């Protein structure tokens, strides 16, 4: 497996990975690709020419880095890839005051806790979803 921050992926490769885990973002390949290309950090994992994992981080250059998602193709899950991506991100952002995770599903919270994140006692993720407006 090769881990890299180089944004060498294609729109089609990203779409295929997102759809493999049933993420609705995969239905918007052009927007997804643009978002990734303008993200602070995109860590990808490759098995030869196949994109098998991706982590996206948005940061403010000093204080806060937010892990927006950690995605691993179903055929590669359970092999420690997601954990290695998170550890890489933790090392890269170790001098920031905060590294936050945004698990899309509560079932993923234990994964983040296992890697040193804490659940915010009085906090909750919130969002506005504009999917129906597009």
Question: Where in the sequence are the language-model features?
Answer:
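Short glycine/proline-centered loop/turn elements that form peptide/ligand docking sites
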Residues: 82, 86, 107-108, 129-130
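Conserved acetyl-CoA-binding loop-helix of GNAT-fold acetyltransferases
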Residues: 72, 78-91
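Conserved GNAT acetyl-CoA-binding A-motif
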Residues: 91-104
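Conserved catalytic-core motifs of GNAT/GCN5-like acyltransferases
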Residues: 100, 113, 118-134
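Short amphipathic alpha-helix that is part of the acyltransferase structural core
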Residues: 1-27, 123
């Amino acid at each position: 497996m090769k881990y890299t921050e180089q944004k060498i992926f294609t729109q089609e490769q990203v779409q295929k990975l997102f759809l493999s885990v049933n993420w609705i973002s995969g239905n918007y390949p052009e927007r997804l690709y643009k978002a990734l290309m303008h993200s602070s950090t995109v860590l990808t994992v490759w098995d030869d020419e196949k994109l098998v994992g991706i982590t996206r981080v948005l940061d403010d250059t000093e204080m806060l880095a937010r892990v927006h998602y950690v995605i691993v193709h179903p055929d590669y899950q359970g092999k420690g890839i997601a954990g290695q991506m998170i550890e890489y991100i933790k090392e890269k952002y170790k001098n920031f005051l905060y590294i936050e995770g945004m698990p899309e599903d509560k079932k993923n919270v234990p994964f983040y806790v296992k890697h040193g994140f804490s659940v915010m006692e009085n906090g909750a993720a919130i969002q506005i979803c504009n999917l129906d407006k597009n």
